[in-house]
Amino acid sequence: MMSNVETIKVVPARYPLRAVGAVVALFVLAVVIQSVAFNPRWEWSVFARWFFDPVILEGVGQTLLLTLIGTALSVVFGGMLALARLSSSWLLSSLAWGYIWLFRSLPLIVVLIILYNFSYLYDTLSLGVPFTGITWGSFETINVLGQFSTAVVGLTLVQSAYTAEIIRGGFLGVDHGQYEAAAALGLPAWRRTVRIILPQALRTILPSGFNEIISLAKGTAMVYVLAMPELFYTIQMIYNRTQEVIPLLMVGAAWYLVITTVLSAIQYGVERGLARSERRSAVNQNRTLSRTRSRSVTTTPAQEPVHASLS
């Protein structure tokens, strides 16, 4: 008996609008590249002359240093704020909420200016009992905050508020059953957090956290109000002297692109490494489970069948 087998021809789906959109996008990209590359008013020769200038590189170094220190301090302080927000103590939770609400509401430039004028607002700081006039010591604030320290403190205060919410969201994203399972192991609270909860929370924290680091790197441009020679203020000083505004702004834009590209590459590598580690852990866990099952099967004695007899 012969079977009738029909050959099914698979026809790929066609998306004409997608092709039209790609052509339009390529056309617009070509127009933009031509207008930017061949317009003499962009002054690319000036751009090339200043891009690796030692003064510019020093400004880039200051920007990277502010980003590194601000990130480290905001992660530490933001982590403490996140734990306070998750605390069962209403006082700690309320204080952390108030801090986060305040510094997420204030623009960074306002915080920097207030900190820079701190010695004007408070010429001396005293330690004592409030509302009694009893003081144990005091010191002048005239030289407490310089340009660099003001920039670091301002960036940390503002950035830690955003970092705290990111870390808190990561902990809340962990399934509640994981907390119960960790508590059942009888480990101390800090070990449960570091060894069990935090690795799972990092999957949620890392993408948003790196976005905040990139925002912080660009936000360092706000410290120009302190006359600190980071990248943007250095470029301002140069183009105020040479009147070559556009090419020097392009130098700054290019360096910010380089910084954010490097940070994005680091983010990609960290996320891939974390995913690879999770896959290895899952494979090892499955192997351990299969070995445990095989051992239980081999060690369990075979039961002889029970035969019923009629007497």
Which residues fall in each region the model found?
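Transmembrane alpha-helices and adjacent helix-loop boundaries
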Residues: M1-S311
